[in-house]
Structures are given as C-alpha cells and as structure tokens.
Amino acid sequence: MMRVKHIAVGSRLLPLSFECKDGEVVHVVGPNGSGKSTLLAAISGTLTGRDGASGEVHVDDKNLLTLSLSEQAHVRGYLCQQSRPAFNVDVFQYLALSLPSGTAITDGKVRDAVNMVVELVQLQDKLHRSIQTLSGGEWQRVRLAGVCLQVWRTINPYSQLLILDEPAAPLDIAQEGLLYQLINAIAAQGIGVLVANHDLNRTLKHADKVLLLSNGVLHSSGRADDVLSEAGLAEVFKTQARKVMIDERPYLIFD
C-alpha cells in the first residue's frame, strides 16, 4: 500500500494526503494547470526539496522520497510526459534498457514478461524498428511497455507502484483500449497504479478511486461515481455536465 502524507510543491500544489491500496487504480483528474503532473512528479521523487517539494510517500515501510534514484526505480515506475530521446536504438534494445538492473533478457522469466507486454500493446511487428521512425502513438506504446517491464512482478518482486502521467494523450481510440488492458494486467499483480487522466468517461469506467484537483488543491476524492458528480464537475471545470445511464453504465455528457 502507498500512503501519501501532506505532499506539497510550493504554491503549485497545496498539502494533500491519500492512500492507494495494492492493486488499486487511482485516477487524478482536473483542469489544465490544476496540479496533476506536479502531484505525480512529487510522488515519484523526481521533484525534491530544491523544487519546493515536501511531504512523505510511504510504500510498505519505506519513505520513497528518502531513497536513492536507483532504489526508487526498483519500487516504482514513472512515465512522465516527454518527447522522443536524442539517442537512436531499435524498439527491442529500448525495452532491454527498461528492464530492472540485474536482469538479462535471455532469462526465461524475463523473456516471457517481455513477450506478454509486447503482445498486450501490439508491438510484435515493431521490435526491430528504430524508435526515431515510430509514430507518436507507436512511440507511446513502446514507452508504456518499457515502464511496465520495469515494475513487472515476475522480474521485479520489489515493485509496488506505477505512475502514468496522461498516458493516453498520444493514443487513438483502439490504442487507448490497449492501454487500459495493460493497466489491468499491472493492477492484477497487486501493484498500485496512479494515472493522470483527461477522459472522464474512462475514469468513470476504470478508476477504483479518483482525486479531483482544482488550482493545486484536492477538491474531493473517493469513488468515481461520487467524485465526478454534475455539481462537482460544474464547480471545478466551469462547464455543465449531465450524467446519463446507457446499458446500466454511467456516462458524462458535456455541453
């Protein structure tokens, strides 16, 4: 279980606390500039006291923020929003670089994990392509595969948390479906998943818990159906939303 205690980043993110249980999928939602990316970066440990970050992130009996970067990498995976790297390798080599330290891609368990993740995000025909020749959606699927291999339990038994900052942004509708299959596979291993997300209907369907941010403040948290209420969304997003039932599932319709 992850326990976040009074995490804050200067005036960008005021102190907030919450928990993420093992295998729980928590979505962080809110308008642009509400503090979603700042919160995830602070929890990941990439923002430090020099950046104005404070608070504690406890994973089991460890404060993640006091660990070295290499120790953090064994406990959590973090996919931020970023452009393509300057170096050039093929997809298979990139995935090999993403594996936890001390593992070899020739190991049977590692090979099985790589094959499973590659199949989940449908990269089988891309393994020998240069990462610089991939489309935006293809490259994002490679990044997702890499960060998931970092925390995949059969090759990294110490992993506890996966943090994804707007992972669906470069993906089309079909690829977005693959993303949520991958998230489900990670959560099924008992790993908590923290996702910054803009598609509120996806949040209604997939999130076990939701944090709704507004101007760096935690507006509300809890079950998706409760947090994403018509009144709460109108207050935070300054727009009207209606919640309707289709095939016994709730959907949001925005004016």
Curated annotation (Swiss-Prot):
Regions crossing the membrane: none
GO cellular component: plasma membrane
Compartment(s) of residence: Cell inner membrane
Record-listed E.C. numbers: 7.6.2.8
Keyword Nucleotide-binding on entry: yes
Keyword field contains Glycosyltransferase: no
Protein topology in the membrane: Peripheral membrane protein
Any matching Pfam family: ABC_tran
EC main group: translocase
Primary localisation category: membrane
Subunit structure: The complex is composed of two ATP-binding proteins (BtuD), two transmembrane proteins (BtuC) and a solute-binding protein (BtuF).
Homology family: Belongs to the ABC transporter superfamily. Vitamin B12 importer (TC 3.A.1.13.1) family.
Protein known as: Vitamin B12 import ATP-binding protein BtuD
Native organism: Vibrio parahaemolyticus serotype O3:K6 (strain RIMD 2210633)
Gene: btuD
